[in-house]
Design a protein with these regions (language model features):
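C-terminal transmembrane helix and the adjacent membrane-cytosol boundary/short C-terminal tail
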Residues: 3-8, 12, 194-209, 275-304
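Membrane-embedded alpha-helices of multi-pass transport/permease systems
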Residues: 37-48, 105-109, 138-142, 155, ...
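Transmembrane-helix boundary motif in ABC transporter permease subunits
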Residues: 7-16, 95-130, 204-205, 219, ...
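Glycine-rich helix-loop "coupling/hinge" segments at transmembrane-helix boundaries
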Residues: 246-272
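Membrane-interfacial helix termini and adjacent extracytoplasmic/periplasmic loops
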Residues: 10, 58-68, 141-182, 216, ...
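Transmembrane alpha-helices
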Residues: 27, 127, 131, 183, ...
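N-terminal signal-anchor/first transmembrane alpha helix
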Residues: 3-46, 113, 123, 127
Length: 304
């Protein structure tokens, strides 16, 4: 009589592979939860806390054998009733959307040219894109302050050439702020687009041309749809930091440039109203989650 050896339901090496994959994914996810979710929860706790002198009252306390909650949503109600905050959020979203649109219009042609350039020239062109990151962000923004001032380089050259009779006010305007943000975040739009376009199968374009499509039709019907994931990734990388930008509006913007980052700074350090500042920050994060959710949905549809 013979006996058959039963195989295990999951082979050991496959089981090790599964647990190894989970560990590789789980460790970064745990780190992200630690450095992003925990600070957000702390900020949310401050937003619903009561001030007790110079400190915050505990949200949850234990007294007389019972749990007591000390949660206040007055700051959220005050924020919803104050038109200034509403205008600031709209202004921040509008400037961020405008900056993202301009970056996309400027970055797409350059990324397309970069992807279609000879392979031996691409590293040099990519280095030009990355070159601004070799210097301090603050110095780069402050350089625009020198260029756009009334006695700056642009006005001086224009007056010397006889193009204008007196300096044009460019500093402390929405124009100067948007210009600074476009300059700062343009590489964040170029790189995802290039990464997407360089992997495109050019045989699809050749097939479209062979079937009678014009180059313009092939571009709009093949190249642009296939680069949607790059457009979405670049747009998120530009839009999200622009919404909460503080340094550029502070250095280049003026009183007409309402940005939520400046309001946060004033609430925290000028008014010393940490609960209200935390409330503004929480609402800003929730507003940013919406485009991120749309981006995730577009990525899922692209993979499908």
């Amino acid at each position: 009589m013979t006996t058959k050896t039963m195989k295990p339901l999951v082979e050991p090496h496959r089981l090790n592979r599964i647990w190894g994959r989970r560990a590789v994914i789980g460790v970064p996810m745990a780190f992200l939860l630690l450095v992003f979710l925990v600070p957000f929860l702390v900020v949310f706790k401050i937003s619903v806390s009561e001030m007790d002198g110079v400190s915050f009252r505990d949200v949850v306390t234990w007294a007389e054998g019972a749990i007591h909650f000390h949660i206040k949503f007055d700051n959220y109600l005050g924020l919803a009733q104050d038109a200034l905050y509403f205008q600031t959020y709209l202004s921040s979203l509008g400037f961020a959307a405008l900056t993202t649109s301009i970056c996309l219009l400027l970055a797409y042609p350059f990324a397309y040219f970069l992807a279609r350039s000879p392979a031996d020239k691409r590293p040099a062109l990519l280095m030009l894109v990355m070159l601004p990151f070799w210097t301090s962000f603050l110095l780069r923004v402050y350089a625009w302050k020198m260029l756009l001032a009334d006695a700056g380089v642009f006005n001086t050259l224009a007056m010397a050439a006889g193009l204008i009779a007196e300096p044009i006010k460019m500093m402390n305007t929405p124009f100067s702020m948007v210009l600074g943000m476009v300059y700062t975040y343009l590489p964040f739009m170029i790189l995802p687009l290039y990464s997407n376009l360089v992997k495109m199968d050019l045989r699809l374009l050749e097939a479209a041309l062979d079937l009678g499509a014009t180059p313009w039709q092939a571009f709009w019907r093949i190249t642009v749809p296939l680069s949607r994931s790059g457009i979405a990734a670049g747009s998120m990388l530009v839009f999200i930091p622009c919404v909460g930008e503080f340094v550029i509006p502070e250095l280049l913007g003026g009183p007409e440039t309402l940005m939520i980052g400046r309001v946060l700074w004033d609430e925290f350090f000028s008014n010393n109203d940490w609960p209200m500042a935390a409330t503004v920050a929480v609402v800003m994060v929730l507003l940013i989650i919406v485009p991120m959710a749309l981006f995730s949905k577009s990525r899922a549809e692209a993979r499908a």
